């Protein structure tokens, strides 16, 4: 079985919240795709409830695209501690951390239920499992800790 980089990361050494560049892969025509670890909470210490994580996921899908070019996908980790962000091209962790911070500031602040895309039976595979209240509370907590552009040394972005 192929080795998966994320499973070789020593989860006891990282300091969440952070943005980590996992890898840059180049396609046959030279196109670069970058995979980021957006770790919102400390692994093996806490996990975001599914309704809150689901709502954060739906909001980040649009908010990150508004804040940076080349977003392909932002999907939650099964462990519920953060997200994979896949982008076209090469972006640095500071740029991504700033986009994430700005997105979470919107979620924690002015976001209203109407801002959450894909919350109906025809637009979501589990539309009843959302909580804007939970998403807001998690966003506030994450922001209060600061988002680092480095997983091992706290380099909190402004």
UniProtKB/Swiss-Prot annotation:
It catalyses: S-(5-deoxy-D-ribos-5-yl)-L-homocysteine = (S)-4,5-dihydroxypentane-2,3-dione + L-homocysteine. It comes from the Bacteria. InterPro entries: LuxS_sf, Metalloenz_LuxS/M16, S-ribosylhomocysteinase. Its cofactor is Fe cation. GO terms for biological process: quorum sensing. Its EC number is 4.4.1.21. Binds 1 Fe cation per subunit. SUPFAM superfamilies: LuxS/MPP-like metallohydrolase (SSF63411). One of its GO terms (molecular function) is iron ion binding. HAMAP family: LuxS. Belongs to the LuxS family. This is S-ribosylhomocysteine lyase.
């Amino acid at each position: 079985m192929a080795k998966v980089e994320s499973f070789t990361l020593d989860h006891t050494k990282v300091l969440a919240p952070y943005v980590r560049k996992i890898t840059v892969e180049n396609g046959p025509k030279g196109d670069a795709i970058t995979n980021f670890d957006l770790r919102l909470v400390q692994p093996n210490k806490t996990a975001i409830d599914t309704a809150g994580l689901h709502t954060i996921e739906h909001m980040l899908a649009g908010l990150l695209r508004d804040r940076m070019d080349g977003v392909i996908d932002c999907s939650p980790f099964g462990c519920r501690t953060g997200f994979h962000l896949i982008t076209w091209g090469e972006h640095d962790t500071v740029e991504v951390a700033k986009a994430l911070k700005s997105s979470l500031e919107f979620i924690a602040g002015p976001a209203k239920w109407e801002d959450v895309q894909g919350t109906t039976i025809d637009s979501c595979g589990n539309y009843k499992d959302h909580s804007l209240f939970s998403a807001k509370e998690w966003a506030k907590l994450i922001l209060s800790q600061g988002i680092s552009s480095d997983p091992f040394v706290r380099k909190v972005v402004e």
